[in-house]
Structure formats: C-alpha cells, structure tokens
C-alpha cells in the first residue's frame, strides 16, 4: 500500500504538459538542426556543381552557409539545456501548486521550492542539531530557489518564442524555392500542361540572391533543369528542408506549450499567494 501511495504522489506531481513539450522540443530541434545542416551542405553542392564554376562567385555563399551551420550547433546546445531547465521548472512549480492546494505533500521538500514559492518558513526542522546536507540535496535546494519563480521563465520563453517564429519563417524560404523548382521541373517533364516553351522554363539562382548577378551561368533551363531535379542530391536536399521546416514547427508548438504552462503556474501561484494560500 505504501508503494502504491508513493507512486500516486509522484504521478500527481508530474507536469505532463511540460514532459510532452520537452519531448516535442527535443525531437523538433533535433529534426531542424540535423536536417537543416545536411540540407545546407546539399545546397552548397548543387550551387557549385550546376550554377557556378567560379569559386569567387559563390565564396560568400559558402561563408554564409558555414555560419548558419555553426548557429545550428548553438541552437541545438541551447535548447537542450533550456529544455531541461523548463522541465525542471515544471516539476518544481507543479509540486508546489499541488502542495498549496493540498493535493500533494512531498515528504522531503523542506526549505526548498515550496518555501520559496509560498514564502513560508521551512517546517519540520529539528532543533537538536543540523543534519548533514548531501550534495544532491544542496543542488536541489539551489535549483528550487531559482526555479521557484515561473515569471522568469514566462518572460524568457516569450522572447525565445518570438525569435523562433522568425527562424520558423526563414526555414520556409528554402522550402518555397525548392518547391517552385520542383513545379518548374514538372512543367518541363509534362510540356502538354503548359503553353510556355520548355527552353524558357528556368531556375535563376541569382534571382533569389543566392549568387551575384554577374555569376555565370547562374541559371539552368529546360531539360538541363529537369536533369537536376531527377538527381538524388536535389531530391534529398528538398526533403531535408521539408523535414527541417517540420522540426521548426514542432519546436514552435513546444515553446507555446511551455509558455502556456509557465503562465498558468505563475497565475495560480499569484492567486493562491494573494488569497493567503486558500483553495479555489
């Protein structure tokens, strides 16, 4: 019976929304960073193979791609650490809320998060002498004092969400370019569906700002473009950009879920604090 009660208490304190958001965030970031990195490398190969033979014409593009790839490394590391912090914050604040509302009473939360959130003094301390503090308990207390303020995470997560919306919008640009290229190739493959001459159907990389206007040839037309679309490099890069876009969307959903959960926890703690920790 004691084991069953312990499991029930643990399940009550689990922030399911934060757990789901963390899994979604890690999966989305992994998809965005991994596929985005490889898609940028594939784009570099396509440009230097089919659209320009002079290295100086696409040298700046290579530097930009390398810079984006380093940014991707930073994004992966940041979201890994921040996702863990948000998950820990969800556990701490959910446990504190359940304790305040009388739904959950953790046995070993003395002087940690609950007293930090509720403002109450630590309870149950012995006056006979101070007990030795283990390293893990000390770390938990330090985390509790910092994580017990969901208002901090609401503001930070809000700013991160705004920035990620911009990244999400930027990740749609290469998908749009590759999709237009694929549509053009379909028109070349089935000339009966269009009245335009096949030789005039082209993809001009200079038009999208990928190459300078003096780049040669800079564009590919007709059957040459169709041959590029049939290559495994083009197909793989196109699908990798789509996967990266989906990963960015999943990460955005995870951030919104985090923000809603942190806002709810903050609101509940504020309301219960103003009403002298009364239930509602």
Curated annotation (Swiss-Prot):
A GO cellular-component term linked to this record: myelin sheath
Extracellular topology ranges: 37-59, 180-239
GO BP field: axon development; central nervous system myelination
Lipidation (S-palmitoyl cysteine): 7, 10, 140, 142
Signal peptide: none
Pfam families: Myelin_PLP (PF01275)
S-S bridge residues: 185-229, 202-221
Recorded topology in the membrane: Multi-pass membrane protein
Residue ranges, Cytoplasmic side: 1-10, 89-152, 270-280
Chain segments annotated as transmembrane: 11-36, 60-88, 153-179, 240-269
Molecular function terms, GO-annotated: structural constituent of myelin sheath
Keywords, ordered alphabetically: Cell membrane, Disulfide bond, Lipoprotein, Membrane, Palmitate, Transmembrane, Transmembrane helix
Subcellular location: Cell membrane
Family per record: Belongs to the myelin proteolipid protein family.
Its biological purpose: This is the major myelin protein from the central nervous system. It plays an important role in the formation or maintenance of the multilamellar structure of myelin.
Protein name in UniProt: Myelin proteolipid protein B
Source organism: Xenopus laevis
Native organism taxonomy: Eukaryota, Metazoa, Chordata, Craniata, Vertebrata
Chain's gene name: plp1-b
